[in-house]
Amino acid sequence: MCLGIPGQIVAITDAGRMMALADVSGVKRAVNVACVAEGPLEDLLGHWALIHVGFAMSLIDEAEAARTLEALRDLGEAQETLAQMAEGAAALEGRG
């Protein structure tokens, strides 16, 4: 399964290699923008993209980015809850 994480393109770092800097939930990541570049790379500044393994795979709007980030946060919270439930069950069974 391929999971893209929303990131906002904040800088072009190497136009020749089609590299940019994206802000992914407050963390700056180097990303290749070759898959989403349709004109001057500077046109990508401020845009949101789904990023997977260092590549901007598709452009999305800010609302979709917010919805995706919220869903990912919810998924993380669900995983934490399931892990806590498993730990509790193990403790009750004398395994923890």
Swiss-Prot record:
Molecular function per GO: carbon dioxide binding; iron ion binding
Any one Gene Ontology BP term: protein maturation
Transmembrane segments: none
Pathway(s) per entry: Protein modification; [NiFe] hydrogenase maturation
Pfam families reported for this sequence: HupF_HypC
Protein's job: Involved in the maturation of [NiFe] hydrogenases. Involved in the biosynthesis of the Fe(CN)(2)CO cofactor.
Family note: Belongs to the HupF/HypC family.
Identification of the protein by name: Hydrogenase maturation factor HypC
